[in-house]
Regions:
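Core catalytic alpha/beta fold that binds nucleotide/phospho-ligands
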Residues: 1-124
């Protein structure tokens, strides 16, 4: 049973401008240390970050827009096949447990300068 659904889009150009303007501060504010390590070698950091940004926003929406869910409470890492895997940490994990979340599905796509993400929280 679906207990939460979120979708978000992010402009790759807006992320690129923020990276240029704020540098590593922007990168570090949005990404966990694990995510920073995963994306540091990507040739297009803005494209990669836009996808993660959209996925984190989609996860927050799937959780019901809780005000105490922060960027670092949602971590997106590649699985063994390279597909995105979303893990909830901190207050996001606590909210998911209260909702009865058993499985998290995430999809990230990029096209025409936009990154889009969908997150489904599956419960009992």
């Amino acid at each position: 049973m679906v207990v939460g659904l979120g979708i978000d889009v992010a402009s790759v150009e807006r992320i690129r401008v923020a990276l240029t303007r704020f540098g590593d501060r922007f990168w570090q504010r949005i990404l966990t240390e694990n995510e920073q390590a995963d994306l540091a070698t990507r040739p297009d950091r803005a494209l990669a970050l836009a996808g993660r940004f959209a996925a984190k926003e989609a996860a927050a929406k799937a959780l019901g827009g809780q005000p105490d869910v922060w960027w670092h409470d949602v971590e997106i890492r590649p699985d063994s096949r390279g597909a995105p895997r979303l893990e909830l940490l901190g207050s996001a994990r606590a909210h998911a447990e209260r909702l009865g979340v058993r499985r998290i599905l995430v999809s990230i796509s990029h096209d025409a300068g936009v990154a889009a993400a969908v997150v489904v929280l599956d419960g009992q």
